């Protein structure tokens, strides 16, 4: 099930990273979590959004299409950097972006005929969340965003907890 996968895909790395972080940085770990401030909370929400939309993309289209849509992260990040950080990309960046957009439109059009467009849409949204996260981190490079990532993973586990159909792992050894 999609939500079961999302729950474990978030809980296990999130809790492992949390424990590891406190073991490695036990004296300063709490201060690091407090120091993320508003940018860290916003970034954690983007991580939450990207985790959810990634799994929904995989559940609603083929893996290749989902990954192509998610590979748009650099394109979307450059657009966000242009809009929010006032960066001026070079002409070649805009040309490459246009070529990528044409390819994505072609893939999206094909998905419309196969009725798999929802997964492609989730893939683009996922890429947008990741690009937004990168933009926040670039704009606040003085912040340690590892605690923010951990928080985002644990928030994803908490949200997905409400939709889990079974806690059975179904491991076969």
Whereabouts are the PLM-identified features?
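Membrane-interface helix termini and inter-helical loops of multi-pass transporters
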Residues: 1-2, 28-30, 59, 105-118, ...
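Loop-to-transmembrane-helix transition segments
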Residues: 29-53, 118-126, 161, 170-173
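Hydrophobic/aromatic residues within transmembrane alpha-helices
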Residues: 5, 9, 57, 83-85, ...
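Structural motif at transmembrane-helix junctions in multi-pass transporters
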Residues: 1-5, 52-69, 145-147
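Hydrophobic residues within alpha-helical transmembrane segments
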Residues: 7-12, 38, 42-45, 72, ...
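C-terminal transmembrane-helix exit sites in multi-pass transporters
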Residues: 16, 54-56, 73-95, 105, ...
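Hydrophobic transmembrane alpha-helices of multi-pass small-molecule transport proteins
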Residues: 17, 89-109, 126-130, 157
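Transmembrane alpha-helical segments that form core, pore/gating elements
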Residues: 2, 14-17, 22, 77-78, ...
């Amino acid at each position: 099930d999609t939500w079961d996968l999302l729950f474990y895909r978030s809980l296990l790395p999130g809790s492992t990273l949390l424990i590891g972080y406190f073991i490695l940085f036990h004296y300063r770990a709490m201060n690091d979590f407090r120091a993320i401030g508003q940018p860290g909370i916003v970034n954690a929400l983007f991580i939450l959004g990207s985790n959810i939309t990634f799994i929904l993309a995989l559940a609603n289209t083929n893996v290749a299409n989902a990954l192509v849509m998610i590979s748009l992260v650099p394109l979307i990040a450059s657009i966000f950097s242009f809009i929010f950080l006032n960066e001026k990309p070079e002409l070649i960046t805009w040309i490459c972006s246009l070529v990528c957009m044409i390819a994505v439109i072609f893939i999206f059009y094909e998905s419309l005929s196969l009725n798999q467009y929802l997964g492609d849409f989730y893939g683009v949204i996922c890429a947008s969340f990741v690009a937004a996260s990168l933009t926040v981190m670039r704009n606040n490079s003085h912040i340690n965003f590892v605690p923010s990532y951990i928080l985002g993973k644990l928030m994803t586990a908490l949200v997905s907890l409400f939709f889990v159909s079974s806690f059975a792992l179904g491991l076969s050894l």
